[in-house]
């Protein structure tokens, strides 16, 4: 499995003034839905952003959907240090235009598990280059990138093969005490378990996980899940 080559040059050019006007309009609609209590709670649990209005994810998705797919706008919004704009960008981005090379610029914005999950849900799982991006991100020392990669493949069940399952042991060993990596691995293996032809590979992967809290969590979760499928 080959990963992504480095990004060599910008892929999109756009009118800064036009994008700024669209951003201001989106931000105004987001601010009307702000919830300070939610923002404070997210900060307490480590969901740090430059600016956070505490707007719910369903509302962000709904507002973003009115823009349609506009990849250059999404790139612009994603660079802003505002939670709602960064998350909206992931639903405005066109997954078909997420090239393997461009993935590195999106990776820089994955600063917490919330962004990682939305990236996996809205963009990465729908990208035609998912396999290559998975290889690159899952090999990263950045647990958020690895988590996004695991969750994206879990959502696109048909892409899971023996090679991907085998790679989980290396991901878990690299992040042996990470709870979110453990959760991502469980999500992927649970999706893989729907295909009985992969059962042997899953069991071998669980045996090869090694030691650590992440490995223990994965084995415990997968034990009852596999039993339930028998």
Show where each model-derived region lies.
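Alpha-helical scaffold domains
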Residues: 16-230
